[in-house]
Design a protein with these regions (language model features):
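N-terminal helix-turn-helix DNA-binding core of bacterial DNA-binding proteins
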Residues: 27-73, 97-104
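Beta-hairpin "wing" of winged helix-turn-helix
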Residues: 83-93, 100
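Conserved segment of winged-helix/HTH DNA-binding domains
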Residues: 100-119
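N-terminal leader segment of winged-helix/HTH proteins
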Residues: 1-42
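Alpha-helical residues within the helix-turn-helix
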Residues: 66, 77, 83-84
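Hydrophobic patch in the ABC ATPase nucleotide-binding domain
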Residues: 28, 87, 119
Length: 119
């Protein structure tokens, strides 16, 4: 068998019971679209570095900018995208704005990703 075909079925049998069972449990298309958009947020090195820092503790914009060697303007743009994706939240205390991860789900997804690449 040629290598190109080694990873495909060599038959035309359809396991209808499996197909029907999975089809019945499959979420609607909008859920897949939303999930793909969520994962797009993790597809940018800068945003991943921001999320990593915030997975350690909440930080103000100035500290994040220094840590990541970014301008506050560039950082604010990325934080806005993360905020719109509900990955981070902020708390204004006077003139200082602190950012943190929105919830433990975000940290879990992030840490699972690191576990996966380390295997």
């Amino acid at each position: 068998m040629p290598k190109a075909e080694a990873f495909t079925c060599d038959c035309d049998v359809i396991h209808e019971d499996v197909v029907n069972r999975i089809r019945a449990a499959m979420p609607e298309s909008q859920s897949f679209y939303a999930l793909a958009n969520l994962y797009k947020m993790f597809a940018d090195n800068t945003r991943v570095r921001i999320l990593w820092a915030l997975s350690r503790e909440k930080m103000c914009v100035c500290d994040l900018a220094v840590l990541l060697n970014m301008t506050k303007s560039a950082l604010s743009h990325q934080l806005k995208l993360l905020r719109l994706a509900n990955l981070v939240t902020y708390d204004r205390q006077g003139k200082i704005v602190y950012y943190s991860l929105s919830d433990d789900h975000v940290k879990d997804v992030f840490e699972r990703g690191f576990e996966h690449i380390r295997e």
